Each structure stands twice: as C-alpha cells, then as structure tokens.
Amino acid sequence: MANILVIQVQGYLMENALPLVTVLIPIVGSILVGLLGLKDVRLSRAVAVIISAFTVYLTAEMFLAALNGYTLFYNLPALAGIAMSMKVDLTGSVFALFTAFIWFLAVLASLPYMAHDQRQVRYFTFLILTLGGCVGVFLCGDFLSLFLFFELMTLAAYALVVHTQSTDAMKAGANYLYLGIIGGLSLLSGIILLNSYTGTVLIEPLMQNLQNTGGAAVLIAILMIAGFGVKAGMVPLHIWLPQAHPVAPAPASALLSGIMIKTGAYGIIRIVTMLYTPSNELAESGLWHFTENIGHVIIWIGIITMLLAALMAVLQNNAKRLLAYSSISQMGYILMGVGAAGYLGYDGAMGFGGFTYHIINHAFFKSGFFILFGIIYTRLHEVNMDKLGGLWRKFPVTFAAFAVCAAGIMGIPGFNGYASKTLLHHAIVEAFEHHHLWDLWAAEKLFMLTSGLTVCYIAKLFISIFFGKLKPETEVKLGRKGQNENFIERVVAIMFIGIIAFLGLAPGAMVSRIIVPMTAPFTYNDYYVNYLLKTSVWNIHDLLGIAIALALGVGFYIFFKRKELFSYSLPDYVSVEYSVYNPAVKILGIAFTRVGRYIDESANRVYHGAPGILARTSVGVGFLDEKTFNLYGRRLVLFCAQAFEGLYSLWIATINRMFERAGKYLRTLFMTMFKFDYETRGDRRFQTFNISNIDFDLFIVLIVIGAILATSLLFIFN
C-alpha cells in the first residue's frame, strides 16, 4: 500500500499520504463501528478488531520505511495561515507502531471483557476514535496539528473514563476533562507564543530562533511542558490518573496508562530534546545553556514524580489504583531521562537511549498489568487486594504473564525493564559527572531508593493477588473448574510474555537497530551515540546496582508487612488535590463570584438610574414650560412626556420579559444537560449509542475548546 501512495521521493525525504491514511482510517472507522452497532453488535465488534489490526499494518509500513532511512511527510491544508503537515521519522514511527499494536491487543482483550455490557458499541466506537487521535499525535510535523490530534484524543477518551457512569466515574471524568482543558489551553498558548516569536510551529531545532526572545522562551517552555505534563501524569498535574484508572474498563485503563500518557511524554521529548536545541550546524555553539537549565529542572520533576508516586503506590489496597500510581512513578523515570538528555545537551545520547527504551518497555508491561488484571476482574468484580489471593491455580496463564510483567517493571535481569533502567541510571550518573553538582548526586540516590520501592509495591500486588489462601467467596464465584481463562485471553497473555522476554533478552539488538537510529534527527555528538551503541548492561557493576535495588525492595516489603503499614492512610492535607486544587477552585469561585457581583451591581445601577434621568429631564422640561412655551407648547411637551413615559414603561416590560425568558431558557438548558446521564429506555438504539450521557462537562468542553480555537486561530495567527 505504501508503494501506491508514494508521490515523490527526494533523497531520504518521501512525500507520502500514508500518515494521513493511517490516522483517517480509525477516525472514519469509528463512525462505521457506531453505525453498524445499531444493527448488529457482533459485526461492530468485528469491524473494531479489523480496523485496529489494519492500523498496525499501516504503522508497520511506516516503521519499515523510517528504518530504511526515509522520512515520510505529507502537507495538510493550512489553518488560519499556518502551514500544517504530517512528518514521520523513526521516533514517531516507533511510537505509532507500539501504540497501534498494544491498542490491537486491548481491542482483543475487550471482546470478552465487554461481552455482556449494554454500552459496548459506544465503548468500541470511542476506543477506535481515540486510537486515531493517539496515533495522529506521533505522526505530526508541527505543534499545531499535534495539538489538534492531542485534543481529539483527550475528548474521545473521556467516554472511556466515564463508561460505567457510576458516581466515581463521573467525578473522575470531570476532573479528567477539567485538567485536560487546562492542559490544552496551556499548550495552545505556548504554541501561539512560539509562532509569534519564531514565525513557525514546526517540530525542529529552533534554539537559534529562541535565544534572543528573553523571557518569552522561558514562558513558552513552561506553558508547553505543563500542557503535555497533564497527560504525562507529571506531579503535581497527575491527580486525574489515580481517579480515572480504577473506574475505567481494564482494557481502557491499559491504554490510558500504557499509551495515552506517552503522548504527554512524547510532547515533552520534542520540546526538550528538539525544539530547545540548536541545529546540527550550530551544535558546537554556545546555545546549549538554556537547554541545560530546562533539563536540570525536568530531572527534578522526574525524581519527585517517581518517588512520591512510588510511596503512594505502596499504600494502596485498590489494585488498579496501585497500578495508576505505578504509572505515574514510571513516568517519573522517563521524565528524569528526558531531563538528563537535555541537561547533557550535545552529549545526551545516553539519556535519550534510556528514556526511549523505557517508554517502549513501560508501554508493554503496564498495559499487560491492566489487561491481565481485567481477566481476573471480569470473574470476581473485585479490586481490593485484601479480598483476593490464591488465584494462581485458577488463572495459570494470567499468573505466568503477570509474573513476567512484574519481573520487567522490577528490573530483574533478563526482562525488559532491566536494560532501560540501567541506561537511565547511566544517564543520571553522567549528568552528575557533567558538573558534579551535589543535587544530582542526591538525585541518583533517590533513583535507587525509588527502584527499591518499585520492587516493594509490585511484590505486594503480585503476592496479594496470586498467593495465600483462596477466599471462600472467591471459590464460590469461580466454581470448581481448574482454569478460568478463555482462548483470546490466553493468546493476549502469551503475546505479552513473548514481547517482554524479547525486549529483555535482546537489549543489544534493540539499542543498535532501533534506539541508535532514532537519534538521527536529534542533535547529538557522534562520540556519545557510539558510546551508547557499545554500552553493555551485562557487567558486574550494573548487575550489582540492580541487586542493591532488589535488596532494598525486599527490605521495604518485610518492613511494611511487619509494621502493618501497607494499609496506612495518609491524612488529607498531604493530598495535592486537598491542599492545592481544592483551595484553587475555591479561590477561583470567589473571584468569579465577585466579578459577577460587580457586573450585576453595575447593571442594577443602570437599570435603577433611568428614572432619575427621566426625573431630571422632566424638571428641565417644566422650567422651559413656565418660561418659554405657550399653551400649545405645554401641550406638545405634555405629549412628549407621556410618549417618553410610555416608551420607558415598554422598555422596562421588555427587559423584564427578556430576563424571565433568559432565566427560563438557562434553567431548561442546565436541567436538560444535567439529566443527560444514561437511563435505560425501551429504545435499543438509545441504550446502545446514547452519546448524550457524557453530561454537562463535555458540553462545557466543546464550548470552551471551540471558542478558544475560533478566536485564537482566526485572529491571533492572522
């Protein structure tokens, strides 16, 4: 198919419509999935599988082209005078490929998971639509088109978060949307400023354009990193993740955790390691100072994120909530690697190798965790780990795959997490040796501490679910049959085992054939790229490092178990939501109330001031009447006064009716949107494909996003 779509080849730059086709197929296909579901649910499910599988094929085509040295591009129609394009280098194609493949596995896992769900057509519709937005993020050549796909993904995924429509799901969905709006507006503001100061929004090295912008360069970096940081789960912008994961269906949680948060990381990568770097021609210049400062900050954001989230994961009893905090912690590892790459600047290839490898690894073992736990959840409908246990005999293939995922995230040698965590450890050590700053020495120690905490909370999760005595209520739910997995679930589990084992046993092949070629469009010193290529993780020093982390983890587990600290509940005031977001919402509420009160009082002054104006006018007319006008003049004035009084009364009555009607319409609109929550009705179409149940929050989002896009793109960009 790729050969058919080739339009022109110029050296290693290939103009090709394949990126656009790859995105349009799931976006348009989602409509087909929804329409078919009105007639035949099974056909709708089958089409969803076919679309996701075909997307894997298309992304594989782009990956092979990029692996052979080609960069695919396709120019999109300009938006408000801003050129947009799709551009696929090896980095984007790798992200798109593992995204599409894991999405395909999640769609397969969704077949048995959603088999008896009345809203499964809506679920598969938005699942495929979100796939289009997510893949589109990785195939863009500029930040504006990336933003549009980013927002499409955000809005479509909302339906996955609130799918169960429980009280907790709706609350989690509201927080997800509100933070998504804030992140989107922050990102858009940064893009607007970037275009204003550089004249372009292309994803390419622009440090030479940004160096003389003063504080604008700092502001652009803050706005764009914060915008992507919301989706990446960066502390303190992470609070939607622990709320969304427990309430979403397990396959959707796998995608939220394993894939969608990678879109945020991808955006930060493109900012820190590309946008804020000089081009290759200026690589030896002194333009790296700003990049180094950004990298230093990102290192510590990553360290804080990984450590705090790991501590929170240790204290969770809800398995899905534990995995949510685990995802935040692992994103901290990735952010630390991005920061190390930025801090090292031209010599940052090791950081690039570490965070890239860990992004791929985390996508597989974390998606595996959620999908595998979903197999158990469909039988038991239980997420409290205290009520689970002894399940390894009932779910043998799930148990084996879960063990492989656990070994991967712990960093046990021979599994995928070991290689990427070792490269990340090398990167933070190199960052310390770059300038020998004491805080980076401390960062390396906290890295090791967090690795130990990771071992601790994963051991808690694994042991609580699969070992111990089988609970009586569990045995009643499962019955006496030996195994509870169906064929599709076993196939998905075995695929996770094979991929994680391959990524762990062949790190040299991954680095030499995938990771190192991915550095080509980035500005890195060839010496350090070759150093990354020759780095071996199978040496006594690195093995000793992971042994220390494993020993710390075992020690933490024994300590927490004996002291009965695994169920310890932290006080509310240490919560970011309690101590930061709730006060911020209250302050904003007070501010908006005062502004509204001022507007209302001003309107009242105008409203009540009109009679005073009329009275003063009457006095003036009376004076003229006595001194100047004759009898006919007085009659004329009296007629005018009566006409004015009549018009005034009519105006007052009209205003009152307008206020009454506006209030009535607003109340009706609010109550209608408020009642949009799903209620079972006799009409099967309403049950199957009721999009309106996304409640008042989506209405707000659509209005805000539409208004912002319309005003900013049509006026600011012109």
Predicted segments, located by residue:
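Juxtamembrane boundary at the C-terminal end of a transmembrane helix
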Residues: 710-718
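Hydrophobic alpha-helical transmembrane segments of polytopic
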Residues: 19-26, 44-58, 92-99, 123-130, ...
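Transmembrane helix-loop-helix hairpins at membrane boundaries of multipass inner-membrane proteins
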Residues: 2-20, 31-125, 200-208, 281-284, ...
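Membrane-interface segments at the starts/ends of alpha-helical transmembrane spans
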Residues: 9-13, 209-211, 285-291, 353, ...
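Hydrophobic transmembrane alpha-helices and their helix-loop junctions in integral membrane proteins
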Residues: 105-115, 121, 131-146, 156-484, ...
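Membrane-interface and transmembrane segments of multi-pass membrane proteins
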Residues: 256, 475-478, 484-506, 510-706
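Membrane-interfacial helical/loop segments at transmembrane boundaries in membrane proteins
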Residues: 2-6, 72-80, 202, 206-208, ...
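Membrane-entry segments of alpha-helical transmembrane domains in multi-pass membrane proteins
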Residues: 11-21, 85-98, 136-148, 290-297, ...
